[in-house]
């Protein structure tokens, strides 16, 4: 028996034992989904999104990894890839993302995005800056933050610059971050 403290409470559990091999296809599928989700989370290390998940985890009384997995595991498939890009959450927060996000103009690797500012104008969130996560189809488990992104929530528009030579499909994840990084 192993005794340990977590959040000020004393717990006991069995001593770890050697893991059994996965037997069913369904178990293998979920094990692969879990591995892909963890790989994706680890790649967020250099993208400065881990602190967002760590803060959310503290609110949920879990660690950041568990908060990320609970929010994103459904997006991954059993082949160590992403099956549903719409289910990916780069970040989570209490403020809603504005309605009517759309790409209005594309010139080379630069995109102009616009959104409806209607209900946010009276909120303190009007000074939040636009952030954009990018997943390229040729590297689905390596998310990046778009560099050279401009846009403030209250302005209703922003510019995004993607990496040069984009020929394949990519997925954009727009969210807003306060000036102090929350």
Residue ranges and their predicted role:
Residues 57-182:
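Charged linear interaction tracts used for macromolecular binding and regulation
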């Amino acid at each position: 028996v192993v005794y340990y403290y977590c959040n000020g409470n004393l717990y006991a559990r069995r001593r770890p034992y050697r893991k059994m091999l996965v037997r069913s296809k369904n178990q293998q599928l979920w094990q692969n989904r879990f591995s892909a989700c963890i790989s994706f989370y680890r790649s967020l290390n250099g993208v400065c999104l881990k602190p967002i998940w760590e803060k959310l985890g503290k609110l949920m009384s879990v660690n950041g990894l568990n908060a990320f997995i609970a929010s994103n595991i459904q997006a991954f498939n059993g082949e160590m890839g992403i099956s549903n890009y719409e289910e990916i959450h780069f970040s989570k927060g209490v403020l809603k993302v504005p309605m009517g996000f759309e790409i209005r103009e594309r010139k080379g690797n630069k995109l102009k995005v616009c959104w409806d500012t209607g209900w946010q104008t009276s909120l303190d969130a009007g000074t939040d800056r636009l952030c954009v996560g990018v997943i390229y189809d040729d590297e689905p488990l390596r998310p990046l933050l778009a560099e050279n992104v401009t846009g403030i929530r209250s302005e209703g528009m922003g510019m995004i610059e993607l990496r040069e030579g984009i020929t394949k499909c990519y997925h954009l994840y727009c969210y807003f971050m306060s000036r102090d990084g929350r």
